[in-house]
Design a protein with these regions (language model features):
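Short, well-ordered surface patches within globular domains
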Residues: 1-43, 96-101, 105-107
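A well-ordered secondary-structure block
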Residues: 36-120
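Mature exported/compartmentalized surface modules and terminal targeting/interaction regions
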Residues: 9, 120-121
């Protein structure tokens, strides 16, 4: 099964990334104690399965294991490589999901918070 990008899923992921920056937390459970499935329900998204990966990477010239992350491509590659090297995150990436959304938000000190959300409607 191939995974396709979905604008609604991008919105779901973006909201979570922005909330992690705005409310200063890093977790799948947000500042209102809502899980990824709760947040999908709040936006009236149908789903039979949903999963989420989160990560953060600094926008910096010398990030351990990544090198210079001061471009959209480099910082994205860095977070994806981190997910690929984590069994739980990688399981989400290769799971039987049909849709994907991605969101990113930056802190004032140039730390990028990424959210990747997968679903089967």
């Amino acid at each position: 099964m191939s995974v396709v990008q979905n604008d609604d899923m991008d919105e779901l992921a973006e909201i979570h990334s922005v909330n992690m920056v705005t409310f200063d937390f890093f977790d799948h459970v947000d500042h209102q104690q809502k899980t990824p499935s709760d947040r999908a329900d709040d936006l009236n998204f149908s789903w039979s399965s949903i999963a989420e990966n989160i990560g953060y990477v600094p926008w910096f010239e010398n990030v351990s294991g990544c090198g210079d992350t001061r471009s959209a491509e480099a910082i994205s590659e860095c977070v994806v490589e981190g997910w690929r090297n984590s069994p739980g995150h990688y399981a989400n990436m290769i799971g039987n999901f049909s849709e994907l959304g991605v969101g990113v938000a930056f802190t004032q000190d140039s730390l990028a918070y990424f959210t990747q959300v997968f679903r089967i409607p």
